[in-house]
């Protein structure tokens, strides 16, 4: 079983090497395999519980696995010895906790070795394949400030300094997620992971584009309902932002926001289909007035508030916003008409308290098991054709809410979960198939 795992890892690293073997200059950001991160987390837990014998057993097993991995991956004896020395150095940073007190904050030091081991081994493999490269440590240039957020000015300065120090190097490898905090301690970026690291580096060097390799494609519809949904080729930043809201697994919002701020395009590529152009996200708005995708969000609660006229209309609206803000509950959609306000939310944590407070000012209707369907594309307010086609497609499906995005990128609707699949099929037939 162990050998099978190693063979899979070897094939995986060889595949990564093929993905980056073109002649363009690049900085490659790498994550540790999930099973390695999980194993290192178990090591940290054993140290924290002072179960030293168990920790030793786990470290030894993983260390031998990495050495076996290097022996199978590499054929050049000199490079192989250097790689094994690099592996032993990383594990020395873990073994030291056998002799030292272990605190919960030390867990990050152990977990970071996964990224360091991965980048070290890939660097040696690429060297053996004749691809000159330099492995640069993220600890040397990725830093967070006192507020825990990425120190973008520092990162930009340091990345440029490192690139200047290697004028003849066109391929750099580094680690995703890991960083130093404001106190110089080993830490992780609070959110965004390797995608965010790539965005920070890409904007620092003003890259031509940021390529994110992910097995989550951006499709024009829910593939569980519409089997032949297409992969979207082009999106504007604002269109992508809307789709990511519905499916954060596509790309972390912080990665998108960072690239958008500096107008650096992002290309999403699937490692299982490396010849595909993927999805290109940029500031360009291609295909005017074209519907790009239909996205959904489930587990929605629909609430309608009808004022009982205890408050004036403007105070009634303000009160609803204030109470939702008080309980840190974000509406997904909101529409208003005179003294009626409709809200759709996916956060039920404090909903009973919110309704209890607002019951003094309004009659309230609540419906669970709803879905939001958002039609995303470049839809200018001057073009009424798309809206008309949406209404025509869904003329036999009850709509609880209709909400227009302020940035002219989407029209969102609230329907019952039981009507969702049929609505998606109708929108695909009437809008997406015709648009393509």
Language model feature labels by segment:
Residues 141-142, 217-219, 274, 339, ...:
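Positions that flank functional sites
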Residues 3, 7-251, 255-256, 416, ...:
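Nucleotide/pyrophosphate-binding catalytic subdomain
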Residues 25-28, 67, 109, 132-134, ...:
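Structural motif
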Residues 277-436:
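A conserved regulatory-domain signal marking ACT and ACT-like small-molecule sensing domains
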Residues 239-282, 287-309:
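A conserved active-site cap/scaffold subdomain adjacent to cofactor or substrate pockets
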């Amino acid at each position: 079983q162990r050998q099978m795992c190693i063979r899979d890892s070897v094939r995986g690293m060889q595949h990564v090497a093929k993905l980056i073997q073109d002649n363009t200059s690049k900085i490659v950001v790498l994550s540790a395999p999930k099973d390695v991160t999980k194993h290192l987390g178990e090591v940290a837990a054993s140290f924290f519980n002072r179960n030293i014998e168990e920790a030793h057993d786990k470290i030894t097993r993983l260390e031998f696995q990495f050495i076996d991995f290097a022996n199978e991956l590499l054929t050049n004896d000199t490079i192989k010895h250097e790689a094994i020395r690099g592996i032993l150095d990383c594990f020395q940073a873990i073994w030291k906790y056998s002799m030292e007190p272990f605190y919960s904050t030390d867990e990050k030091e152990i977990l970071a070795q996964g990224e360091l081991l991965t980048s070290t081994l890939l660097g040696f493999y690429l060297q053996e394949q004749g691809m000159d490269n330099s492995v640069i440590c993220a600890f040397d240039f990725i830093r967070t400030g006192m507020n825990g957020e990425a120190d973008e000015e520092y990162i930009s300065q340091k990345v440029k300094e490192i690139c200047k120090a290697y004028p003849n190097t066109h391929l750099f490898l580094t680690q995703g997620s890991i960083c130093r905090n404001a106190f110089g301690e080993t830490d992780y970026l609070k959110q965004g992971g390797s995608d965010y690291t790539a965005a920070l580096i890409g904007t620092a060097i003003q890259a031509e584009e940021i390529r994110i390799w992910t097995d989550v494609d951006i499709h024009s519809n829910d593939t569980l309902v519409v089997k032949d949904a297409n992969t979207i080729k082009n999106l504007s930043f604002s269109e992508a932002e809307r789709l990511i809201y519905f499916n954060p697994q596509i790309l972390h919002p912080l990665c998108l926001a960072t690239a958008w701020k500096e107008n650096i395009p992002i290309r999403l590529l699937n490692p299982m289909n490396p010849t595909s152009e993927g999805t290109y996200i940029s500031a360009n708005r291609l295909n005017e007035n074209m519907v790009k995708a239909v996205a959904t969000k489930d587990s929605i609660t629909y609430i309608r508030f009808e004022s009982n006229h205890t408050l004036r209309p403007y105070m009634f609206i303000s009160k609803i916003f204030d109470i939702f803000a008080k309980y840190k509950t974000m509406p997904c959609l909101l529409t208003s008409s005179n003294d009626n306000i409709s809200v759709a939310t996916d956060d039920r944590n404090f909903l009973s308290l919110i309704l209890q407070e607002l019951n003094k000012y309004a009659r309230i209707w609540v419906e669970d098991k709803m879905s939001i369907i958002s039609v995303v594309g470049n839809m200018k307010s001057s073009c009424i054709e798309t809206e008309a086609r949406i209404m025509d497609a869904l003329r036999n499906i009850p709509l609880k809410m209709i909400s227009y995005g302020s940035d002219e990128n989407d029209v969102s609707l609230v329907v019952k979960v039981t009507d969702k699949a049929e609505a998606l099929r109708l929108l695909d037939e009437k809008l997406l198939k015709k648009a393509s």
